[in-house]
């Protein structure tokens, strides 16, 4: 049986996306030394997600870490090498998180790190920046 939950938040980068969730309890960075530019594999040894791929996933994390170089890394992964995530959900989206030109949502009516689990199917509907967005979470029991 599936469980479905809908959360409302604010679109920080517009678009629609869906994919399997990858949830990091730790702050997350997009530099080439954190997520490989050509494979999308996480190479942050201190992160429990080390070795997993962000490709085609909805990545959920508290907020970004690292320098503004991460914005170039995220853009490259999403738009050039095509190994980036399809969307981002954060407690607090930083300007770095919108550089990938993929949907990014924060300001949710619940804590995304508590509501979304790795493996859940997540759909983002973020049609206009600064306006309400919805996140639909589907969990198979």
Where do the protein language model's features map onto the residues?
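Secondary-structure transition/turn motif
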Residues: 136-141
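Feature captures the catalytic cores and cofactor-binding loops of soluble hydro-lyases/lyases
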Residues: 2-17, 21-134
């Amino acid at each position: 049986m599936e469980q479905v939950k809908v959360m409302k938040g604010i679109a920080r980068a517009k678009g629609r996306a869906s994919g399997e969730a990858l949830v990091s309890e730790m702050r997350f960075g997009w530099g080439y030394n954190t997520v490989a530019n050509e494979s999308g594999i996480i190479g942050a040894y201190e992160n429990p997600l080390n070795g997993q791929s962000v490709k085609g996933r909805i990545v959920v994390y508290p907020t970004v870490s690292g320098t503004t170089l991460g914005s170039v890394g995220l853009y490259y992964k999403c738009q050039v090498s095509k190994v980036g995530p399809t969307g981002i959900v954060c407690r607090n989206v930083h300007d770095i998180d919108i550089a990938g030109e993929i949907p990014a949502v924060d300001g949710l009516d619940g804590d995304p790190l508590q509501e979304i689990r790795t493996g859940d199917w997540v759909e983002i509907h973020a049609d206009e920046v600064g306006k309400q967005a919805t996140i639909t979470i589907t969990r198979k029991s």
